[in-house]
């Protein structure tokens, strides 16, 4: 099965990012494909390399970057949501790219299921 994910909450303010990352890894481990993760609203904070969590905490940005590197998952950050929050190409972590809502629509068309994480 081919999945597309949308994450609409920040990494340290809501469980959505943690749950989405765990879902993506579990799906891949079961032989499914996660074709794209679209970060929308406060979810764009998952993509900034400026995040510096304490050493004893999860580093969501690095986790997502590793998912891209290991499984070639397309990590797309909504351009409008990113710009509203001061996130530009210069501060994106490795593996992320900025694009428009058309990428979410495209993922919804190509994927068998689109799963949303966040309120």
Residue ranges and their predicted role:
Residues 17-32, 37:
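Histidine-anchored nucleotide/phosphate-binding helix
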Residues 24, 35-40, 74-79:
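Short internal beta-strands
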Residues 85-116:
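C-terminal structural segments of small proteins and small subunits
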Residues 5-18, 46-52:
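Short, glycine-rich nucleotide/cofactor-binding loops
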Residues 6-8, 38-40, 79, 116-118:
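Short beta-strand segments
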Residues 50-55, 92-94:
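Short glycine-enriched, charge-decorated loop/helix-capping segments at active-site entrances
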């Amino acid at each position: 099965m081919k999945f597309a994910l949308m994450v609409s909450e920040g990494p340290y303010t809501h469980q959505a990012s943690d749950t989405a990352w765990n879902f993506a890894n579990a799906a891949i481990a079961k032989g499914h494909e996660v074709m794209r993760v679209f970060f929308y609203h406060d979810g764009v904070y998952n993509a900034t390399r400026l995040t510096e969590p304490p050493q004893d905490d999860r580093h969501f940005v690095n986790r997502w970057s590793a998912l891209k590197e290991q499984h070639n998952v397309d990590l797309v950050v909504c351009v409008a949501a990113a710009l509203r929050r001061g996130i530009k190409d210069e501060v994106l972590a490795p593996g992320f790219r900025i694009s428009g809502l058309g990428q979410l629509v495209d993922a919804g068309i190509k994927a068998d299921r689109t799963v949303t994480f966040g309120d």
